[in-house]
């Protein structure tokens, strides 16, 4: 049996061993002479110590921190020690022969506080485990190598001004990465480095508090406090860190408003209307926001009735405005007091009040030219209708309030009385009618009267005058509408045919009740019964007569009850018709069959159809004629004969390409008569002609014809020759024939009767000319 002892030894130079631990372990052993294995209880010779490695320790060589040893190791070199686990082979190495464990670099507890490893002894030759692996821990022992830090710094805090001593402002917290369970490396103490005597800090909790009372924001609004955290309980040698706390004092309403001056003086012209700004007052309040809001008011007195004051929402100014019209002649100055008060008052600071202030205000009224003032804002007048022109309607009056007063002149603005129904006296404002008024045409007349100062036409004012036309009984009653009624021939006696209504254009209440009466007597075909409400019922007294061509005309008399009473007569038309069983009209003989001209409906339709057909034919014919005329006119407009130039001539001069005026060709009858004076020659481009067939009778006739055409061309060059041969005095440069002057007219100087050489030699272009001048017969075809 092999007994194993595991020893963890501490290095004498400062590495600590925490104790020895012995534990029995079972071991298997074989005995000669026994048939099976025998279980023996042997002593497990392990001594277990926990390792501690000081962090940040470093040396020139790896540091021995412990040793592994087994009692099976006889020192013969047959045992090999193995180390596995966290950091084995890199941070920790083991000597396989001796079991010494070394650390190869300095360790940081804040990165890793402990390492768990496995140790095992094996046979060097066969690598057979001599014992099971055993786990042990190497702890990194902390040292004070980390200063406190404030992870949330720098801090910003707010505390109300005028806070009591000890008011909590903010809590700061520092963090120390060292081991809080080992020594005082992580025990922190807070102190104030800068910010005394205004603030203090709790050494243990880091709560910052106010240290003095009545800190005023208006004196100092912001404070910078420096807080330090020191480990090792604040003792010497400890590490420290600091942060800043910016403390801002928030505003409270601890200051009343104050007027910078006790008396304000303003001036305003008397013509300033209500709402006109007189001046601004400013009560100063050093507080902020809602705590600085100020409300202004006028204390009881003479000023509160004439002036008003409000607060400007932007600048917190007091806006003094006019409330009622001012009059320099009545009062020239006002003196009153204005109070400024905080709108929000904190009861906690009433001891610093009162939160209001008072100032005096004096307003001087300045004189200004004023327009005339009417005695009333509007005037309402009345005049009866049908009165003669010049009837008095009423009078208006205006006065000049200035001193001295100026005379007033009155006039009616034309746009308010376009029909010139009224007139006004310019000096006293008396209004009279200019025409007879009719209430039924227009009830109200709205005039605009202009009052102007005689000394200053710029000073004027206007007033509205409403004139009502009063009613008189001047309209006779009449029927509300024309009545054209039909009644069935089968109607029963006493049947109501129609309710006839009357209309009186006079005003209701002016005896406008209307009575109606129809024909009376035994011969009356219809009965009219007055309903005494402005209407009458038309009744059938007996069975109606058979239908007839002419309708019944019933006279109706209408009268009112005015003074004097007015009456009129109207006619109601009643036709007797045949009706269907449902009561609707079927026909009224003969009006239903004939038109007013005596023609039937079918005849009228036939006549209208024929007239429409004839009218359509006429329109179609005119349209076709217009279309044909337009087509001819288009061809005439597009006549381009004057632009056609023949280029197959023998000449080459520019004068040969000039076209003649086409106007005379288009209108030969309108050609101008031959002009007086010397003959003017006009050369035009010759055109190629085909040989004439048959041949002219003789050369003498042709010569006579050419002479006639030549004379016409010489006397009237504006008329182009249609059928004549043009004679050129010069063929143009570059021609193989030279000049053709020998063919010039007889009127030219030096002209000869014929060409000097045979024309047949000149080619086919001159064949016609050769035939005209030649004596021989043309060649046979």
Curated annotation (Swiss-Prot):
Residues 733-746 have a biased composition (Low complexity). Keywords: Calcium, Cell adhesion, Cell membrane, Cleavage on pair of basic residues, Glycoprotein, Membrane, Metal-binding, Repeat, Signal, Transmembrane, Transmembrane helix. GO terms for biological process: cell-cell adhesion; homophilic cell adhesion via plasma membrane adhesion molecules. One of its GO terms (molecular function) is calcium ion binding. Residues 46-150, 151-259, 260-374, 375-479, 479-592 form the Cadherin domain. Residues 23-44 form a propeptide. Residues 625-781 are cytoplasmic. Residues 45-603 are extracellular. CDD domains: Cadherin_repeat (cd11304). Disulfide bonds: none annotated. It is a single-pass type I membrane protein. The chain crosses the membrane at residues 604-624. Residues 665-700, 731-762 are annotated as: Disordered. Coiled coil: none annotated. It is found in: Cell membrane. Residues 1-22 form the signal peptide. It holds the Pfam family Cadherin. SMART domains: CA. Glycans are attached at residues 446, 510, 525. Associates with alpha-, beta- and delta-catenins. Three calcium ions are usually bound at the interface of each cadherin domain and rigidify the connections, imparting a strong curvature to the full-length ectodomain. This is Cadherin-24. The lineage of its organism: Eukaryota, Metazoa, Chordata, Craniata, Vertebrata.
């Amino acid at each position: 049996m092999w007994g194993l002892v595991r020893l963890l030894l501490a290095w004498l130079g400062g590495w600590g061993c925490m104790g020895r631990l012995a534990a029995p372990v079972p071991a298997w052993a074989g005995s000669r002479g026994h048939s099976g294995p025998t279980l023996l209880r042997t002593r497990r010779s392990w001594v277990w110590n926990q390792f501690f490695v000081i962090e940040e320790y470093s040396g020139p060589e790896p540091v021995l921190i412990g040793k592994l040893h087994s009692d099976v190791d006889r020192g013969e070199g047959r045992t090999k020690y193995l180390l596995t686990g966290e950091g084995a082979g890199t941070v920790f190495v083991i000597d396989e022969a001796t079991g010494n464990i070394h650390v190869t670099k300095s360790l940081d507890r804040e990165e890793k506080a402990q390492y768990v490893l496995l140790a095992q002894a094996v046979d060097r030759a066969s690598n057979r485990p001599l014992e099971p692996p055993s786990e042990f821990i190497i702890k990194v022992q902390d040292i004070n190598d980390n200063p406190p830090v404030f992870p949330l710094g720098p801090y910003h805090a707010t505390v109300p001004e005028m806070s009591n001593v000890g008011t909590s402002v903010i809590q700061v917290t520092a963090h120390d990465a060292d081991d809080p369970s080992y020594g005082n490396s992580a025990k922190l103490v807070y102190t104030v480095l800068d910010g005394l005597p205004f603030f203090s800090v709790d050494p243990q909790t880091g709560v910052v508090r106010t240290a003095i009372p009545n800190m005023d924001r208006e004196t100092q609004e912001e404070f910078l406090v420096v807080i330090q955290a020191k480990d090792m309980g604040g003792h010497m040698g400890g590490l420290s860190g600091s942060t800043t706390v910016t403390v801002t004092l928030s505003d409270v309403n601890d200051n009343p408003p104050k007027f910078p001056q006790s008396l304000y003086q303003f001036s305003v012209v008397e013509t300033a209307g209500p709402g006109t700004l007189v001046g601004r007052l400013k009560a100063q309040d050093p507080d902020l926001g809602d705590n600085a809001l100020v409300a202004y008011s006028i204390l009881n007195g003479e000023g509160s009735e004439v002036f008003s004051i409000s607060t400007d929402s932007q600048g917190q100014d007091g806006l003094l405005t006019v409330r009622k019209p001012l009059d320099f002649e009545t009062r020239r100055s006002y003196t009153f007091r204005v109070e400024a008060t905080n709108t929000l008052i904190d009861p906690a600071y009433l001891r610093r009040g009162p939160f209001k202030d008072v100032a005096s205000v004096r307003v001087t009224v300045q004189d200004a030219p004023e327009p005339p003032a009417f005695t009333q804002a509007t005037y309402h007048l009345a005049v009866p209708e049908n009165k003669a022109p010049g009837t008095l309607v009423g009078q208006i009056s205006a006065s000049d309030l200035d001193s001295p007063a100026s005379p007033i002149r009155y006039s009616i603005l034309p746009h308010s009385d376009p029909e010139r129904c009224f007139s006004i006296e310019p000096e006293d404002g008396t209004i009279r009618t200019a025409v007879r008024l009719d209430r039924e045409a227009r009830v109200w007349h709205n005039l605009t009267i202009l009052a102007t100062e005689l000394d200053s036409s710029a000073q004027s004012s206007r007033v509205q005058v409403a004139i009502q036309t009063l009613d008189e009984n001047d309209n006779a009653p009449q029927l509300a509408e024309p009545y054209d009624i039909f009644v069935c021939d089968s109607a029963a006696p006493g049947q109501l045919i129609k309710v006839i209504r009357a209309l009186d254009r006079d005003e209701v209440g002016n005896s406008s009740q209307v009575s109606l009466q129809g024909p009376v007597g035994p011969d009356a075909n219809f009965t009219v019964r007055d309903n005494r409400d402005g209407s009458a019922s038309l009744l059938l007294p007996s069975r109606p007569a058979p239908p007839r061509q002419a309708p019944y005309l019933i006279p109706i008399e209408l009268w009112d009850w005015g003074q004097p009473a007015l009456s009129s007569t109207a006619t109601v038309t009643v036709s007797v018709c045949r009706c269907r069983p449902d009561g609707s009209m079927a026909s009224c003989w003969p009006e239903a069959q004939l038109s007013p001209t005596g023609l039937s409906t079918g005849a009228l339709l036939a006549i209208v159809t024929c007239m429409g057909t004839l009218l359509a034919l006429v329109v179609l014919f005119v349209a076709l004629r217009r279309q044909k005329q337009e087509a001819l006119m288009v061809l005439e407009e597009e006549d381009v004969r004057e632009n056609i130039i023949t280029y197959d001539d023998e000449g080459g001069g520019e004068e040969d390409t000039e076209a003649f005026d086409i106007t005379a060709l288009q209108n030969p009858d309108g050609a101008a008569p031959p002009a007086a004076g010397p003959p003017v020659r006009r050369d035009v481009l010759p055109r190629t002609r085909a040989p004439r067939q048959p041949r002219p009778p003789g050369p003498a006739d042709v010569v006579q014809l050419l002479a006639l055409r030549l004379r016409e061309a010489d006397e009237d060059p504006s008329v182009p020759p249609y059928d004549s041969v043009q004679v050129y005095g010069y063929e143009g440069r570059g021609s193989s024939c030279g000049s053709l002057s020998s063919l010039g007219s007889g009127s030219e100087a030096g002209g000869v009767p014929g060409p000097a050489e045979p024309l047949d030699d000149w080619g086919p272009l001159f064949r016609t000319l050769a035939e005209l001048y030649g004596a021989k017969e043309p060649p046979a075809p």
